[in-house]
Amino acid sequence: MKAKKISALLLAAAMTACAVPAQGAAADEPKVPKYIFLFIGDGMSYPQVQTTNYYLNAIEDDGDDILTSESKLNMMKFPVAGSAQTYDSTSFCPDSASTATSISTGHKTYSGTINMDEKMETSYETIAEKLKKQLGYKGGILSSVNLNHATPAFYAHQASRNNYYEIGQELIASNFDYFAGGGLKKTTGS
């Protein structure tokens, strides 16, 4: 029940972020978002974002104090932003697999597990799968690391993040529309 509420909240937040009307548009006209983006900065949190903003303000050298400068990262200008508690079932310091599961499904799981329950028997439906199935959205993954790595493997349902070959097989069967990234790891299954 709690997981369903979290999934619904994540979906609502994603849709709200993209549905904010453009300037001049009537506020009472509902708009369906054309695109929904979910950015995951692996290991990133508010201190990293704020430090990057301070750094960029410092190198701009506009004479303003970096702590009071009005200049902001583009991602800090979004009208709606959210965060999630991505600790997992077993650890306060989780890994990429369980945090990706928390973000994509609203469920907690064991470290090292991608989109499956703690017994590693039941697959969780991801927000990307729901958006595609229920609303007809296209889905894609863009990554700077291999596409069968735990974080970009949003499409997979595996008991172990180290099942690179099986994760790659799920990529093919995922029905996602676009993939781009750092290749695949262990493509032969050996």
What are these regions (language model features)?
Residues 11, 15-19:
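Hydrophobic core
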Residues 18-29:
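Sec-dependent signal peptide cleavage junction
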Residues 1-10:
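Bacterial N-terminal signal peptides that target proteins for export
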Residues 28-190:
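N-terminal catalytic scaffold of extracellular/periplasmic and nuclease hydrolases
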